[in-house]
Amino acid sequence: MDYLTIILTLLFALTLYEAFSYLSRRTKNLPPGPSPLPFIGSLHLLGDQPHKSLAKLSKKHGPIMSLKLGQITTIVISSSTMAKEVLQKQDLAFSSRSVPNALHAHNQFKFSVVWLPVASRWRSLRKVLNSNIFSGNRLDANQHLRTRKVQELIAYCRKNSQSGEAVDVGRAAFRTSLNLLSNLIFSKDLTDPYSDSAKEFKDLVWNIMVEAGKPNLVDFFPLLEKVDPQGIRHRMTIHFGEVLKLFGGLVNERLEQRRSKGEKNDVLDVLLTTSQESPEEIDRTHIERMCLDLFVAGTDTTSSTLEWAMSEMLKNPDKMKKTQDELAQVIGRGKTIEESDINRLPYLRCVMKETLRIHPPVPFLIPRKVEQSVEVCGYNVPKGSQVLVNAWAIGRDETVWDDALAFKPERFMESELDIRGRDFELIPFGAGRRICPGLPLALRTVPLMLGSLLNSFNWKLEGGMAPKDLDMEEKFGITLQKAHPLRAVPSTL
């Protein structure tokens, strides 16, 4: 009898709580969403693949929904129509950032163009990025560096083809991306598979990616900030400190060289010159922090996208053959591809779009935040709410995409859909004023790497695995990675 009383009391309390939550949601006019549990809210619904969990919930609650994740009110956008409302029509209202606690290490969020509020400092840094690093003229001027680094990747794969060893595609692409950026910025390689010191830098950047991608209790329960229960901020402080120390040394070295040997005219020189001529735009601290931004944002996204593209090629041999046939016809089998060739390779570009549709590198984009209450499609988004745009769900929306889960590059052959933030059905790089500033570089680099790998070798899965058996399971983190790294064996065409 006592147990029955306890059970009935608990059921009554739960019913009251559900009713209170429902009335509270109605009173506040929040978007629909699951009823939260006491204290944890809806955290239990996320699982280890929250992009999938929230996509599934959106089918029940709608393309705009609200959840309580711990202490944080979170609004989730899951359709192109709602994304356009948030990222274009009300872009300014949704332009602030929800800053992960890990980015409080070394106060990185106070210097980073990714996390700064849209204000004068942010505008100055965006101007520097757009004019001096990612402009068409600047990218044209250093095109030869990217070609050289991609050819070094091909040479690495050729060595493996001669020995019959498999290539860890993601790791090889990660190393190439690091060296590509380090040459653009510092005119030197910072990683080498045969150098312990270079390996240390590669591991440092990799560890930053790993820590940044871990779910952090503090992000859901800010009252735990001083405790840092998982030690994530502590480890990020160590990693950031070591990278910034390295960058500081490279800046000192360059300043000395400029006094005696003149300028190299790479990104670092351009930034130092800008700092001297317009110190109000950027200073030394911002230069070092911008370099950190570039490495963190530009390596994992590039390598994971290339790994997914190669995985889809190996999973779908007919698509790989079609891509290779186009390359052979337009470029010539085994010949070097230049960036200027990409526009003559429509099917390769479609492969890239389809890869980014199914496997957006950052599934929730970068979290946004509203500083004031905002109305969206009749619903209230309360002040301080975190806003997640589920680009993964939008790219797999069955009301927009025919056979949405199938890899079909052909769907883009007659389509005008673009990935530059104008078409909200496909926004792997975001949209609006917060769109990824590195987009112009990514649109050159990833197709060049993929086309070069496919035009230089035939590829098969390690151990004679059949294409249908290739595991395409995802691993959620700062980027959307393959749960099981792609290992493939190159052979001579």
Swiss-Prot record:
Side of membrane Lumenal, spans: 1-6
Top-level taxon of the source organism: Eukaryota
EC number: 1.14.14.83
Catalytic reaction annotation: (2E)-geraniol + reduced [NADPH--hemoprotein reductase] + O2 = (6E)-8-hydroxygeraniol + oxidized [NADPH--hemoprotein reductase] + H2O + H(+)
GO cellular component, one term: endoplasmic reticulum membrane
Binding locations of heme: C436
Matching InterPro entries: Cyt_P450 (IPR001128), Cyt_P450_CS (IPR017972), Cyt_P450_E_grp-I (IPR002401), Cyt_P450_sf (IPR036396)
Stretches of the chain found on the membrane's Cytoplasmic side: 24-493
Tissue expression: Expressed in roots, stems, leaves and flower buds. Hardly detected in mature flowers and fruits. Expressed in the internal phloem-associated parenchyma.
GO BP terms: monoterpenoid biosynthetic process
Induction remarks: Up-regulated by methyl jasmonate treatment.
Keyword Heme: yes
Chain ranges passing through the membrane: 7-23
PROSITE patterns according to UniProt: CYTOCHROME_P450
UniProt entry keywords in alphabetical sequence: Endoplasmic reticulum, Heme, Iron, Membrane, Metal-binding, Monooxygenase, NADP, Oxidoreductase, Transmembrane, Transmembrane helix
Co-factor(s): heme
Keyword Membrane found: yes
Cellular compartments annotated: Endoplasmic reticulum membrane
Its membrane topology: Single-pass membrane protein
Family membership: Belongs to the cytochrome P450 family.
Role noted for this protein: Hydroxylase involved in the biosynthesis of hydroxygeraniol, a precursor of the terpenoid indole alkaloids such as vinblastine and vincristine. Also able to hydroxylate in vitro nerol and to catalyze 3'-hydroxylation of the flavanone naringenin to form eriodictyol. No activity with apigenin, kaempferol, p-coumaric acid and ferulic acid as substrates.
PANTHER family listed in its UniProt record: CYTOCHROME P450, FAMILY 76, SUBFAMILY C, POLYPEPTIDE 5-RELATED, GERANIOL 8-HYDROXYLASE-LIKE
UniProt miscellaneous comment: The recommended numbering of geraniol gives (6E)-8-hydroxygeraniol as the product rather than 10-hydroxygeraniol as used in most publications.
Protein name: Geraniol 8-hydroxylase
Organism in which the protein naturally occurs: Catharanthus roseus
Phylogenetic classification of the source organism: Eukaryota, Viridiplantae, Streptophyta, Embryophyta, Tracheophyta
